[in-house]
């Protein structure tokens, strides 16, 4: 897995170097932007329209979403450790416009 074997990561977009550093350093830079929250099923569509949803897990009680956002996406959201997938989504994903 790249996260464990890479000594340095470069993030480029449109030919421009956005970030460079060790995986640990770069992941720390987005630590406060990765959230999880348990939400009722009816909230999912609204959150998907307004935020980058990295993951969705179903359970009997609620739906757990992993969201990339610079602000808390939901009142009960909590910060979680970022992964390289989260890093990729932070820099390259766009918020869905499912209209």
Predicted regions and their residues:
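ABC transporter nucleotide-binding domain
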Residues: 1-67
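C-terminal coupling/interaction segments
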Residues: 55, 59-99
């Amino acid at each position: 897995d790249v996260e464990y074997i890479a000594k340095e990561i470069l993030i480029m977009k449109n030919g421009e170097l956005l970030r460079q550093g060790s995986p640990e350093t770069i992941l720390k830079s987005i630590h406060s932007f990765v959230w999880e929250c348990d939400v009722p099923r009816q909230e999912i569509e609204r959150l998907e329209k307004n935020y980058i949803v990295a993951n969705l897990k179903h359970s009997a009680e609620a739906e757990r979403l992993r969201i990339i956002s610079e602000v808390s996406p939901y009142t009960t959201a909590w910060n979680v450790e970022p992964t390289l997938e989260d890093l990729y989504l932070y820099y390259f994903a766009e918020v869905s416009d499912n209209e």
